[in-house]
């Protein structure tokens, strides 16, 4: 018989540096999960992506066990890294804060493709371009 699923917890945690402090501790603690075990497993799985924010979906089961799936970093984080900026524009239609090339857009789209609802690379690229424009970043 399959385990009874208690909850799905979605978090965004910096890669390789998960610790029991908020937001991880309270989110897992309220479901009775072993926080340190999760932190060790997450850090081991993401140590090659240090510095990136990694979305994770944790499935908690009734017997207090858990499984988790790591996703690709958010598109906005990848775009900011490619444009070498700290944050997007407050007024994206007026103030442009950076530029990225079509090649960089394609690279980000290839990386994000498994997590996007896009059917092919072209629609994934359009999605990434839309995100970049809404952040005040020009595509050259």
Swiss-Prot record:
Cited Pfam families: Ribosomal_L11, Ribosomal_L11_N
UniProt record, GO biological process: translation
PTMs per UniProt: One or more lysine residues are methylated.
Parts of the chain that traverse the membrane: none
SUPFAM superfamilies tied to this protein: Ribosomal L11/L12e N-terminal domain (SSF54747), Ribosomal protein L11, C-terminal domain (SSF46906)
Keywords (A to Z) from UniProt: Methylation, Ribonucleoprotein, Ribosomal protein, RNA-binding, rRNA-binding
InterPro entries named in the record: Ribosomal_uL11, Ribosomal_uL11_bac-typ, Ribosomal_uL11_C, Ribosomal_uL11_C_sf, Ribosomal_uL11_N, Ribosomal_uL11_N_sf
GO terms assigned for molecular function: large ribosomal subunit rRNA binding; structural constituent of ribosome
GO CC terms, sorted: cytosolic large ribosomal subunit
Subunit structure, interactors included: Part of the ribosomal stalk of the 50S ribosomal subunit. Interacts with L10 and the large rRNA to form the base of the stalk. L10 forms an elongated spine to which L12 dimers bind in a sequential fashion forming a multimeric L10(L12)X complex.
Function: Forms part of the ribosomal stalk which helps the ribosome interact with GTP-bound translation factors.
Family in the record: Belongs to the universal ribosomal protein uL11 family.
Protein name: Large ribosomal subunit protein uL11
């Amino acid at each position: 018989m399959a385990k009874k699923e208690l909850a799905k917890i979605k978090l965004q945690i910096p890669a390789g540096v998960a610790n029991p402090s908020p937001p991880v501790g309270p989110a897992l603690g309220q479901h009775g999960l072993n926080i340190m075990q999760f932190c060790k497993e997450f850090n081991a799985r993401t140590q090659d992506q240090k510095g990136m924010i990694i979305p994770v979906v944790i499935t908690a089961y009734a017997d207090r066990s858990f499984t988790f799936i790591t996703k690709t970093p958010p598109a906005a984080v990848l775009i900011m890294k490619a444009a070498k900026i700290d944050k997007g524009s407050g007024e994206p239609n007026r103030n442009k804060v950076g530029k990225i090339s079509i090649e960089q857009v394609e690279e980000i789209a290839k990386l994000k493709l498994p997590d996007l609802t896009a059917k092919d690379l072209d629609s994934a690229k359009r999605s990434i371009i839309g995100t970049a424009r809404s952040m005040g970043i020009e595509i050259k």
